[in-house]
Amino acid sequence: MANASICTIGDEILIGQIVDTNSSHISQALEEIGVKVTRMTSFGDDHDEIVCNLTNELTHNEIVITTGGLGPTKDDITKAALAEISGSKGYVVNESQLKMVHEILHARGLDVLDINKAQALVPDTCEVIVNHLGTAPIMVFRFPKERY
């Protein structure tokens, strides 16, 4: 049985502005497929804190799932922290997610701003699963077991 950690990221979670309901749903889904959740944790929008905490979680679990920290705001720096941890050399535009950003915002009658387009910029070290429900992509990083 694989072990997993669920990490919620965002100052809004820590100050109680948003309630973390994602972890419960994710934990139940993982349990159904035989993955044991060993830890759920939350931390704020601080680059060094994200890097430190995620690196620690990677040393103890085969799977680390993060939620939050990817909104179209300037203070969401989770993507940069993940790029650093994964050894990314830069960002690439994921055209499929960019198309989805346009579709979602146009369906809501909103203009697509540069900050929205930036959601489709992903570290070159990840695979992307297109998010059909929101503008932030689902990024999958694979780390060699011996690395952590």
Q: Predicted regions: what is each one?
A:
Residues 1-41:
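Glycine-rich phosphate/diphosphate-binding loop of Rossmann-like nucleotide-binding domains
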Residues 49, 77-148:
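Proline/glycine-rich low-complexity loops and linkers
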Residues 61:
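An anion/phosphate-binding loop that grips the pyrophosphate of nucleotide cofactors and donors
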